[in-house]
Amino acid sequence: MYDYKIKLGRNIKEIRQNARLSVNQLAYYFGVKPETLKDYESGNLSVPTLILSEYIDIKNDNGKEVKKWINQHLS
């Protein structure tokens, strides 16, 4: 049986990896614990719509805005 949450989780993990963002970086950006982000990526938790739309933006700009935001907030 096709499991939508697992497929979605794999897709968002691939987006994060392609943008060369770590779990910790992206968790910080989203304001969630790294364990929560891992649960999204494994399909154990449903991804909130707001976070899912952010993944689309990350895919479109290859994580540039996220990296910029992280650098501004860690400086």
Regions found by a protein language model. Give the residues of each.
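A short, Lys/Arg-rich alpha-helix, primarily the initiator
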Residues: 1-18
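Short acidic DE-rich linear segments
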Residues: 71-75
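The alpha-helix within a helix-turn-helix
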Residues: 16, 27, 56
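Short alpha-helical DNA-recognition segment
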Residues: 20-38
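DNA major-groove recognition helix of helix-turn-helix/homeodomain DNA-binding modules
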Residues: 48-69
